[in-house]
Swiss-Prot record:
GO terms for molecular function: allantoicase activity. Keywords: Hydrolase, Purine metabolism. It holds the Pfam family Allantoicase. It catalyses: allantoate + H2O = (S)-ureidoglycolate + urea. Its EC number is 3.5.3.4. The keyword Translocase does not apply. This is Probable allantoicase 2. Pathway: Nitrogen metabolism; (S)-allantoin degradation; (S)-ureidoglycolate from allantoate (aminidohydrolase route): step 1/1. NCBIfam families: allantoicase (TIGR02961). PANTHER family: ALLANTOICASE, INACTIVE ALLANTOICASE-RELATED. The gene is alc2.
């Protein structure tokens, strides 16, 4: 589940929420009006776009993204994408990296809700991102303010051209009424709706990666901080998918061997109201869910009997002492 190092100038939604258009989680490019120069699937590749000088194929210069032919008629090109999970979109990244003389002058995104794999012809599409001016070889971050959960997107290029990557950052929606009473659910799973509130340092990898499914693919697939040269410790705050009583915790240091944290601890609380900034301040004083525990390299560390009985909580702060990398974090709990 490796993910690119994030643009340090990218907005907060890129670090907080999951990419609903990630094919590793089930997203799929279903149909494109044209993909002559480069297939639609490349647009969803989770890795950063690359440029390979001198690489050509039967259709011309090989480009890492979705690229249509030059349109000689009226109209515009489009691509329909099924999201990995139905979700509320908070922001998108329309990335034209390496497309310089062949990027679309503008793009927009429509959205719909459909139970079908491919939306029917009579699907009702709504504007999610209005027509937005694009430039070549750069990220275009667009905030979205729409509380509705969608299943499919339609990316429109005006009139044609290439889009290196599409990232759709949002919070998946799950039907919690189907969860059995007493069932243990991963309350830290990003696919269940958990998200990263804040982290004090993400030099080598975003803390939100800890919430991704599966085990890390490599050392680059996790949260890793820079080497701490001053007193203190590093930390990350997670908003749980739902309020719950945490029964089991897993801290996975997969692939972190010379750079795993020496110890970890957890603080937790049930929080109502406030802002992310206020949570960061409050979290310093939350009660301990788990006292300091030693960690080892490249291992899953499970804690059950060591957990304090705090009752239902909504947020957890992971402290790593003094610094290092954590691949995955699981909070198995019962819904409150």
């Amino acid at each position: 589940m490796a993910a690119p190092i994030l643009d340090p100038n990218a907005p907060a939604f890129t670090r907080r929420y999951m990419n609903l258009a990630d094919p590793r989680l089930g997203a799929k490019a279903l149909f494109a009006s044209d993909e002559f120069f480069a297939p639609k699937e490349r647009m969803l590749d989770p890795e950063p776009a690359v440029f390979i000088p001198g690489k050509y194929d039967d259709h011309g210069k090989w480009m890492d993204g979705w690229e249509t032919r030059r349109k000689r008629t009226t109209g515009h090109d489009f691509c329909v994408v099924r999201l990995a999970r139905p979700g509320v979109v908070y922001g998108v990244d329309l990335d034209t990296s390496h497309f310089t003389g062949n990027f679309p002058p503008a793009a927009s995104i429509d959205a719909c809700v459909s139970d079908a794999d491919t939306p029917p012809d009579d699907a009702v599409w709504e504007t999610l991102v209005p027509a937005t001016t694009l430039a070549g070889n750069q990220h275009h971050y667009v905030d979205v303010s729409n509380p509705r959960a969608y299943t499919h997107l339609r990316v429109n290029l005006y009139p044609d051209g290439g889009l290196a990557r599409l990232r759709v950052y949002g919070q998946p929606q799950r039907d919690w009424s189907r969860a059995a009473r007493g069932e243990l659910v991963d309350l830290a799973a990003i696919e269940n709706g958990a998200y990263l509130v804040a982290a004090n340092n993400e030099h080598f990898g975003p803390a939100s990666r800890m919430l991704m499914p599966g085990r890390g693919a490599n050392m680059g697939d996790g949260w890793e901080t820079r080497r701490r040269r001053e007193p203190g410790n590093d930390w990350a705050i997670v908003a749980l998918a739902r309020p719950g009583v945490i029964r089991r915790v897993e801290v996975d240091t997969a692939h972190f061997k010379g750079n795993f944290p020496d110890r970890c601890s957890l603080q937790a609380a049930r929080v109502a109201g406030g802002t992310d900034a206020s949570l960061v301040t409050q979290a310093m004083f939350w009660p301990m869910l788990l006292g300091e525990q030693p960690l080892g390299m490249d291992s899953v560390h499970t804690f059950e009997t060591q957990l304090a009985a705090l009752g239902p909580v909504t947020h957890v702060r992971l402290n790593i002492h003094p610094d290092g990398g954590v691949s995955r974090l699981r909070f198995w709990g019962e819904l409150a």
